[in-house]
Amino acid sequence: MTDKKDEKVKVEVATYNWGPCLIKVKILDDFKKVLLEEAKKNEEDYRGKLAGQIRKETGYSDKSRDKIIPYLSPYLGIYDQCFQRYQNKKYDKKPEYALTALWCNFQRPNEFNPPHDHDGKLSFVIYLSIPDPLKKENAEYKGRSCGPGGIQFMWGEGPRDCVSYQ
């Protein structure tokens, strides 16, 4: 992360006040680097576990996850702060997190993730690399949705099976 133990790093956080507590942060380059380096070592094919129409979706090994957790932990702390603000209430007991799944999607043109849900209490998405042509295409998009390469979050009171894969 950083070489200096006491060095404070400023992280900009955007919050979205609807449904669940949703935040947006930009991760540090060293975290991004370790995620990419470890993803290149992935051998487990995750396609059978995921909703994506993506040719390459791979799971991180336990060894890789052990390397990644120290980089991820500070962001869980940031989320905790935001969640307490969102609830307008301090935790009675600080939550403990278990990383039950971690994978990387290597998404190419014309591949996509359809609407789907994730199990567990907390879920996150990290964009490790966005091609410049896609950034340009998104910037030029005139519609009302998130546009090319964007991400959309849906929330509702219905059960998990409200998303159909038929």
Q: Locations of the language-model features?
A:
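Catalytic core of non-heme Fe(II) oxygenases with the double-stranded beta-helix
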Residues: T100-Q166
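Non-heme Fe(II)/2-oxoglutarate
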Residues: T2-E96, A101-N113
